[in-house]
Amino acid sequence: MKFTVERDVLAEAVGWTARSLPLRPTSPVLNGLLITASAGEVSIASFDHETSARQIIAADVEAEGVCLVPGKILAEICRSLPNAPVEFTADESVIRIHCRSANFQLAGMPVVDYPELPELPEISGTVDGAEFAEAVKQVQIAVSKDETLPLLTGIRVEINGDTMTLLATDRYRLAMREIKWNPVNPDVQAAVLLKAKTVSEVGSTLSGSGDLSIALPAAGELIGFAAGTRRTTSVLMDGDYPNIRALFPEQTPIHAVVRTSDLAEAARRISLVAERNTPLRLKFTQGSVAIDAGRGDEAQASETLQAHLSGDDITVAYNPAYLSDGLKVFGTEFVRFSFTDAPKPAVISGQDEPLAEDDRNYRYLLMPVRLPSN
């Protein structure tokens, strides 16, 4: 096998596919990248029996062939090469890389032992790539890190008509984002549970300014994503995800609206002097919200901001990290807190003006911390 390709093109493709290499592979060959050269193009792929990544790049192919190369070292080599065409050759078990005056020789890995790459399922529809990336950032903050509850370490994706919904929860907060789905078949409904790492990778590396194609599993356990020359597949997670939609209250008689940046900065400042996870108290009254943390001999801090309150005065407390996580992913100038009463979760949504309707495409439900009685 022999081909020549620009350094930047090769480095980008190798770097992207190498991101999917397993940390603890069940077999040494899974540390490798499968490189296939054919007429005018080169395919670079990784697979760990659960997640596959594949990118096709244009190249000047002099001799077709297939080889398996240690992935991480190849990625490091490609990043270090000078900005010039790279000549890549593979002969039996020896791989040679030449770029200007730089020469590398690596031992190849046995291609025969590498698992067969899964095919991308049939495309079911598309979403706007940038919108999907934003949605992933907004919901992944609520993904659980508790490996004893594996279902909650995933992100649920639901398809209904022309709407895609992403959901995640760690039992203390819940994030839900709806985006426009462009289906091939508008009658198809689906609900799948994906590894959060897979969804995060798709959001950060496949979702550019164009469309992201998604292949839902008509049968079996494989979902696929495609954008440009990149393809990735992943097996689904098993189990029944809890019906977390039911946790959103139907009616919320109390609403408070605060400027997002002001509240985020105040929460950050007050958290500086509060002990770890000391609750932030928010006391909403007509025209203002008083924020404070700490009591008695503890370090204390407080700040008062302008707020628009509809309904009765209310005092609540939240885990400062959970509140800050939510505020960071809102792209609106204002956030709205919707309450039933103080002991119940609040629904946080965004809006562009203090007296406007809220944008319910993204909602962040946050459990309160119980306040002391004295």
Residue positions per predicted region:
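Structural preference for solvent-exposed beta-strand-turn elements
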Residues: 1-374
